A protein has these predicted regions:
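Solvent-exposed strand-loop boundary residues in beta-sheet-rich modules
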Residues: 69-73, 129, 233
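Non-catalytic extracellular/lumenal accessory regions of secreted precursors
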Residues: 17-47, 134-156, 164-166, 178
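A metal-dependent hydrolase metal-coordination microenvironment
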Residues: 140-286, 291-320
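Non-cytosolic beta-sheet module surface loops
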Residues: 43-45, 54-58, 111
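Noncatalytic modules at the cell exterior or secretory-pathway interfaces
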Residues: 48-51, 96-118
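Bacterial N-terminal signal peptides
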Residues: 4-14
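Edge beta-strands of jelly-roll/beta-sandwich modules across compartments, strongly enriched
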Residues: 63, 115-127
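Surface-exposed beta-strand/loop patches in noncatalytic accessory domains
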Residues: 20-32, 56-92
């Protein structure tokens, strides 16, 4: 990895603004080995915003992007093309706002697809002493909602919904709520990919839509299968192969927080169109459910549903209660 530091001062003409330090980090993508690797950088005291610009330098390769602070997770943008920005009170989608702690941070890079070899990456990390993002007063710490009330009855809902906090989706929670209410739903589970940044917007959305329940969750997205963590409000590491990170450990961690671990679209094998969508991992003991309808019968149809039902039926035949 090569590191270039560009400091801005009154005596130096450089591509950095006042109050910024630019770190240019580039290098080769490790060939083989684990699916994720890390590019560390140091953040000094007084930094209030960090921007990470990223490039996979290829029309054919696909790299995914995330960010860790000294304590761990700060966001996972996956295939988001825009830069990642984190600040004290605001962040770009998929990332978590909060204190910018001095110390060793790292860019997390996932090797989603590598065909143009040798592969390389390029990063520009911008450290600022003043924020550039507009305030996001709608962000707040997540607290469980009391529920809809109304007593025992059947409740209609959607257990696999992505908001704009996922790279493959655009709608804010208000638009999701409007569609859900138009279809007579009582709840929606917001299962964004490998992040829980959406939970910071739940309080405002729930207050605006008291008759629609927003259920926390996350889509545990790996390169060999996706699973839904229904009810999850604590992040669980998805980087399979890193120390202590296994499917069994992840499923157990979700179960420990009261979330249901459900395999999503288990037979959806579309290659590069949907990387890792078919389930190829082992089946964890804590598996609670299997998604058998993805996208609705009117769109995905029996092309997805029959194979998913067969997958579920086989597991039930092995003695599992799902």
């Amino acid at each position: 990895m090569r590191l270039t530091i560009v400091l801005c001062c009154s005596l130096l003409a450089a591509p950095a603004l006042a109050g910024e330090t630019k770190l240019v980090l580039d290098g080769p993508v490790p060939d083989g080995g684990l699916d994720h690797f890390f590019v560390p950088f140091d953040v000094p005291e007084g930094t209030v915003e960090i921007e990470v610009q990223h490039d996979d330098l290829s029309d054919d390769n696909i790299l995914d992007w995330g960010l860790d602070d000294p304590s761990g997770f700060r966001g996972w943008g996956g295939g988001n093309s825009e830069p990642a920005i984190v600040g004290l009170d605001a962040a770009s989608r998929s990332y978590v706002a909060g204190p910018i702690v001095a110390g060793s941070w790292r860019v997390v890079i996932g090797k989603a697809k590598l065909v143009d070899l040798p592969a390389s990456y390029a990063l520009t990390v911008i450290l600022r002493d003043a924020g550039t993002l507009a305030p996001q007063p709608e962000r707040a710490a997540y607290h469980p909602f009391a529920g809809l009330g109304g007593g025992p009855r059947w409740y209609a809902g959607d257990l696999h919904v992505h908001s704009r906090e996922s790279g493959d989706a655009k709608p804010p929670l208000a638009d999701i709520a409007a569609l859900a209410r138009s279809r007579g739903l009582d709840f929606v589970e917001i299962s964004d990919h490998n992040t829980l940044s959406q939970l910071e917007f739940f309080a405002a959305a729930q207050a605006a839509q008291p008759d629609l329940l927003f259920v926390p969750g996350s889509e545990f997205t790996t390169y060999a299968g996706h699973a839904n963590a229904i009810g999850a409000s604590v992040w669980v590491d998805h980087k399979i192969g890193q120390p202590g990170v296994t499917i069994a450990a992840a499923a157990a961690a979700y179960a420990a927080q009261g979330a249901l671990f459900s395999i999503n679209h288990p037979a959806l094998d579309l290659g590069d169109v949907c990387i890792g969508c078919a389930w190829k991992h082992e089946i964890p003991a804590e598996l609670a459910a299997v998604e058998v309808a993805t996208g609705g019968l009117d769109k995905a149809g029996k092309f997805l549903t029959d194979d998913a039902i067969a997958f579920w039926d086989q597991l039930c035949g092995e003695g599992r209660h799902l």
